[in-house]
Regions:
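NAD(P)+-binding Rossmann beta1-loop-alpha1 motif at the extreme N-terminus of oxidoreductases
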Residues: 1-41, 67, 72-73, 103
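Residues in the short beta-alpha loop(s) of Rossmann-like NAD(P)-binding domains
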Residues: 10-11, 45, 118
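A short, aliphatic-rich alpha-helical micro-motif
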Residues: 30-34, 60-63, 129
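Glycine/threonine-rich flexible loop motifs
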Residues: 43-56
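ADP-ribose/adenylate-binding Rossmann-like module
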Residues: 60-80
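Rossmann-fold dinucleotide-binding core
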Residues: 75-157
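Active-site-proximal catalytic alpha-helix in oxidoreductases
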Residues: 109-116, 137, 141-173, 182-196, ...
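Interdomain hinge/lid region at the active-site interface
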Residues: 146, 190-255, 265
């Protein structure tokens, strides 16, 4: 897209592909962001987000005034607001802009991006987001992007479990699961989960496009936010329990399509 890019990660090999395509490797967060016009982060867990933004030599301390900060990790809406407030105090506009679409969307530049923060800052960041995503929406004040991602993950939880249950039922009823998937994919039951993860469930292909352990983190955040609002989410709660049971069996590094394992007869 023509933008000069500097990258930093804890493990240099994680950035190797980006460096091979022209990005410049930096040895610290401070070195990476010191001259940046826009800083983009995508890490694993809320504690990782806190570390890269708030620690000594971190982003808020090291980024130049005016640089746009965009955290694209799925994390707590409360943390997104904290980053926004701390960054604003140093003259750094900040957006929470989590994504959906998995590894396929990332590689193809077709991610869904949902952003919270000040709308004029979102407009300034939009050309960069357009290099990564296809469905890019401004959702409102700081934290709104993360709240939208919570809604996204709630919907995915039910959809993924629904596909696994449908295929498990088809098998138990003596149907050809592949033929069943083909038939129901042409009707109103169709979903991204059905089209993309349904075939993987049939093949028992559990290579991660999105890790179970990270989905557990997302669902836990969503349930926490719901509980803060005295909102019951029974489907999310049940699916979270299924995934936690899989993680307890050592399967946290498998892809979310491995939920079909929860329906295997022992």
């Amino acid at each position: 897209a023509g933008y000069p890019v500097s990258v930093y990660s804890r493990r240099e090999e994680s950035a190797r592909e980006a460096v091979e395509k022209g990005a410049v490797w930096r040895r610290s967060i401070a070195d990476c962001v010191r001259e940046a016009g826009m800083v983009i982060t995508m890490v694993g867990y809320p504690k990782d987000v806190e570390e890269v933004y708030f620690k000594e030599g971190g982003i808020i301390e090291s980024a130049p005034a005016g640089a746009i900060l965009a955290d694209m990790t799925t994390t707590s809406p409360k943390l997104a607001v904290r980053i926004f407030e701390a960054a604003s105090a140093r003259g750094l506009p900040a957006l929470d802009a989590p994504v959906s679409g998995g590894d396929i969307g990332a590689r193809n530049g077709t991610l869904a991006i949902m952003a919270g923060g000040e709308e004029d800052i979102f407009r300034r960041a939009l050309p960069v987001f357009e290099c990564m995503g296809k469905t890019i929406r401004y959702q409102g004040k700081a934290g709104s992007g993360q709240h939208t991602k919570m809604a996204n993950q709630i919907a995915i939880a039910g959809a993924a479990a629904g596909v696994a249950e449908a295929l498990s039922y088809a098998k138990a009823a003596g149907l050809d699961p592949a033929a069943t998937l083909d038939a129901i994919s042409g009707g109103s039951a169709v979903s991204w989960q059905m089209l993309n993860n349904g075939p993987k469930m049939l093949k028992r292909d559990f290579a991660p496009g999105f890790f179970i352990k990270h989905f557990i983190k997302d669902m836990s955040l969503a349930r926490e936010e719901a509980e803060d609002r005295e909102l019951s989410l029974p489907v999310l709660t049940q699916v979270l329990e299924l995934y936690r049971a899989l993680a307890d069996k050592g399967l946290g590094d498998e892809g979310t399509q491995a939920i079909i394992r929860a329906y295997d007869k022992e």
